[in-house]
Each structure stands twice: as structure tokens, then as C-alpha cells.
Amino acid sequence: KPKHMASPKDIILEAPIGSATYNNEFGRPSIFGYFRTLEYKDYGFHKPIMLAGGIGSIKESLIKKSNPKPGDLVIVLGGPSMLIGLGGGTASSIKGQSNSDLDFSSVQRSNPEMQRSAQQVLDKFNSRNTKTPISFIHDVGAGGICNAIPELAKDCNLGVKISLANIDCHDATMSPMEMWCNESQERYVFTISKKKLP
């Protein structure tokens, strides 16, 4: 077993604790979960899968996304860009190869406190009696904002003008590529009319 890989025993004992810790800090505890493993003969390093989940609800008026209009603002909500998570989307898709340097540089770091703060902003928008001012929202996952913002633009059939100088960064020495492509956690991108921005 490669040294950087957790053993099945470690995953079984520690993974539920990690899930519960994050969700409890966020304020949405994990209320169910289970393990799954292959029951037929296989070859390689055996690694069980842990699944966890919770239950949520959504207002009927928020089920469908609206269509942003030309001139609407694109907002990046959540934590700053940090020099972490570069190559995570690639690392998670590689077959038959393992590069510990890539693995560790691509590991994302969770920040439940920031996630909770971002969620409270969205909750405030969505708790209004009138319709939410957010017209379109997209999570920031693999690829960071260099993936999320173009996907948002494609889904809206619009172009986007980006100013990297306006991207909040944790490290002032980050290159444009690092600012654009890092996969820092706890971020969303959404569109909103200039008139509706609080």
C-alpha cells in the first residue's frame, strides 16, 4: 500500500468522524450513512467507500433558475482564493498512476465556518417574502472559478467579463493562473442585477 493512502480500517474509523465534524460545525449534522465494499474478487488496494447524507428542503419558487440579463453582475461568494486544490479535478480522474506531489497539492481544505457564513447569505436572500434577487447560482468545485464561471455563462447563453484584480486572494503573490484555477472550498458564483445588490 502506498504510504500516502489510508488503510481500510482508518477509513472505517476516521471517515465518519470527519464527516460528522464538518457537518456539525456547519450546523447541518449528518443523520445517516453507510459503507460499501466490493463483494467479488478484485485486484489492487482495497478501499471501502463511505457515504453520508442529510435531508433538506427548498421553496417551490426557488426550484428553477431564472435567466440573467446582459449587464448583471457575477459575484463570487465565500472564501478567498488560496494556493490549494490546483489539479484536483485532474488528480481525481487519473487511472493507474499516482503522484504524491500532485495528490497533496491538489487536496482541498474544508472550512465549515466560511461555508456556514456563505450559506447564511444565501438563506437571507431566500428568506425574503419576494423572489430571491439571485437569478442564477453555480457551485465552485473541480476546476475552481475557471470552470464555474464559464459554465454559468454557457448555461445562461451569455458572455462574461472577468477582472482578476477583483478576485479576493489569500496570497498576493498568486499568479493569474493560480487565482483563476485553484479549487479553494466553500465558494459559489451567482448572478444578480445591479439594482438588486444590497
Language model: regions and residue ranges:
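Glycine/proline-enriched, intrinsically flexible loops and inter-domain linkers
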Residues: 1-198
